[in-house]
């Protein structure tokens, strides 16, 4: 429920605060005082587009602040609202209410605040959408649009889940259908691409490269190309350490022999110091002997056949053939091969693959067709009930002979257009255009009097009749949203007399389950208010203020609304009659 709104520098309003209660609240005022700005402010709190031209002349920005409570809402809705608050880091006030604020700068962007935290306007709108249902004169014009009529019917039928399933199937079907059409149109290109990939993969498989093989080959080739030099170095080093491989003379001048002689000489004395040196020489001798042995093994492992280098060079040339075509190194070639195999699976142009895609398209179309039929049935069943309830509401709004109808027809197309349109074949055999919201065309029909031909609403209803149709529809739809604040901005335009009384009576009934806020110019409607607010000019600069009326002030305002009879005794008497009649009607 909306408990308070504060408006600053918006249109004709300089600074104004209005407090709201449960029940029916009406806002009245002379033309030009800015009573519609209250509704404009609520639209801003609902996330509507900010219009800098609405900022009051001389001010830098306009500010709208509202306070909402959620105690009258269903637990499910409250949980959704708490989820939005938690996601944005917003908080409730100590009394559990939530403050929302929107500022509109004359020169810069607008700003939105929810529970003390800055949020995008979209997030603010997501929160207040659950709390406010705003209806204005523009809604009457939207009501004649087919898409708005379908949305109203779906809202009544609770068709959200069915619509969502239909859209999901339609998206999947369109994607698969596009893939099939693309495959058929590009079959030659796909075949050529597949052939190129197969040839390349065959070439790579025939070479059978191993990860890192090209780098290992470079090291081997460098080693083999320096074979003679490596052998000479190793032979000389071994000879210096322990003699040549074929040297059987241990008395030579190599390091092992010399160190052996030194060790023997040191061990031949009784001097402890010299014998300690012998131990150290022995340790070094062990290392030298081991190095000499390993050098011998190295020499034995060196290739003696020059063909080893040739085979390495041939292998390197094979790998270079691949790296020139597919990647900078062998690891890159292997990665390219993996990706190409995946692409080749996608490019499967075999009859079996094409048949598989066709089968998937057919299955998705079958599921989509059934979902469309289910959605159509849901709408048709709901259309009959909704039409009866709206007709009953119109009777309560002084249109006892009015007839309201809803037709739900399938959007069939000629079979010749099947391939050119997003169309599905229905179980009945007909071909229907698969629109984003189903295969149905929804149309509201209306006849104001008995015996008149029912025509589309756009062609048959006057402004006043359209106002009552919209109000009747909203009253019926509102039964599923108890606790929501409903705001009507001059929906009674073009209405007067007995019809105005009936509208006031119906709004009062609606206010038993909802907080209802109405901007009206009709005294018959204003008389039914539980709270009467007037927007009036409060200064020489044309600024307006909002004031709560009671007693004689309220009588005077109703008299003013009665064709400007405010200062006359007859006007006041008539106003009191309206108030008394409304009070009795509500009791």
Swiss-Prot record:
ATP binds at residues 29-36. The keyword Protease does not apply. It comes from the Bacteria. GO terms for cellular component: bacterial nucleoid. Keywords: ATP-binding, DNA damage, DNA repair, Nucleotide-binding. It holds the Pfam family SMC_N. GO terms for biological process: DNA recombination; DNA repair; SOS response. GO terms for molecular function: ATP binding. The keyword ATP-binding applies. May be involved in recombinational repair of damaged DNA. Belongs to the RecN family. NCBIfam families: recN. This is DNA repair protein RecN. It comes from Mycobacterium leprae (strain TN). The lineage of its organism: Bacteria, Bacillati, Actinomycetota, Actinomycetes, Mycobacteriales.
């Amino acid at each position: 429920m909306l408990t308070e709104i504060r408006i600053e520098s918006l249109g004709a309003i300089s600074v104004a605060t209005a407090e709201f209660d449960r029940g029916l609240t009406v806002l009245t005022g002379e033309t030009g005082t800015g009573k519609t700005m209250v509704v404009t402010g609520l639209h801003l709190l609902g996330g509507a587009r900010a219009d800098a031209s609405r900022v009051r002349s001389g001010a830098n920005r306009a500010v709208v602040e509202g306070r909402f409570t959620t105690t009258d809402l269903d637990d499910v809705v409250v949980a959704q609202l708490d989820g939005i608050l938690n996601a944005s880091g917003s908080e409730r006030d100590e009394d559990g209410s939530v403050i929302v604020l929107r500022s509109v700068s004359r020169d810069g962007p607008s700003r939105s605040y929810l529970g003390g935290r800055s949020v995008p306007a979209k997030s603010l709108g997501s929160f207040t959408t659950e709390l406010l249902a705003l209806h204005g004169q523009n809604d009457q014009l939207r009501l004649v649009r087919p898409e708005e009529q379908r949305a109203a019917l779906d809202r009544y039928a609770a068709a959200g889940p069915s619509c969502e399933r239909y859209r999901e199937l339609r998206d999947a079907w369109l994607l698969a259908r596009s893939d099939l059409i693309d495959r058929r149109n590009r079959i030659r290109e796909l075949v050529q691409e597949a052939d190129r990939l197969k040839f390349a993969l065959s070439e790579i498989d025939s070479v059978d490269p191993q990860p890192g093989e090209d780098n290992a080959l470079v090291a081997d080739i460098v080693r083999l190309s320096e074979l003679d030099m490596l052998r000479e170095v190793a032979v000389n080093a071994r000879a210096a350490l322990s003699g040549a491989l074929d040297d059987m003379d241990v008395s030579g001048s190599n390091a092992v022999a010399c160190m052996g002689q030194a060790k023997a000489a040191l061990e031949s004395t009784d001097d402890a110091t010299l014998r300690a040196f012998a131990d150290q020489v022995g340790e070094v001798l062990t290392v030298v002997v081991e190095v000499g042995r390993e050098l011998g093994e190295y020499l034995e492992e060196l290739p003696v056949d020059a063909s080893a280098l040739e085979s390495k060079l041939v292998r390197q040339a094979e790998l270079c053939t691949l790296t020139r075509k597919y990647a900078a190194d062998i690891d890159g070639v292997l990665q390219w091969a993996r990706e190409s195999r995946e692409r080749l699976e996608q490019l499967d142009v075999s009859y079996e693959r094409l048949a598989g895609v066709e089968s998937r398209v057919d299955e998705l179309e079958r599921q989509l067709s059934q979902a469309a039929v289910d959605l159509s049935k849901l709408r048709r069943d709901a259309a009959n009930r909704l039409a009866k309830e709206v007709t009953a509401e119109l009777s309560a709004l002084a249109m006892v002979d009015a007839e309201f109808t809803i037709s739900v027809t399938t959007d069939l197309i000629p079979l010749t257009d099947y391939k050119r349109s997003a169309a599905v074949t229905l179980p009945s055999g007909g071909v229907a255009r698969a629109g984003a919201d189903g295969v149905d065309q929804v149309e509201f029909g209306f006849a104001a009097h008995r015996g008149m031909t029912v025509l589309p609403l756009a062609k048959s209803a006057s402004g006043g009749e359209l106002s009552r149709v919209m109000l009747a529809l909203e009253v019926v739809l509102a039964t599923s949203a108890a606790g929501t604040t409903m705001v009507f901005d001059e929906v009674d335009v073009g209405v007067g007399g007995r019809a105005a009384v009936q509208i006031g009576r119906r709004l009062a009934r609606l206010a038993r389950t909802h907080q209802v806020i109405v901007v009206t110019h009709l005294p018959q409607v204003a008389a039914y208010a539980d709270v009467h607010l007037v927007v009036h000019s409060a200064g020489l600069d044309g600024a307006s203020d909002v004031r709560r009326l009671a007693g004689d002030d309220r009588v005077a305002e109703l008299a003013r609304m009665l064709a400007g009879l405010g200062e006359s005794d007859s006007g006041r008497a008539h106003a009191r009659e309206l108030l008394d009649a409304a009070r009795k009607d509500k009791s």
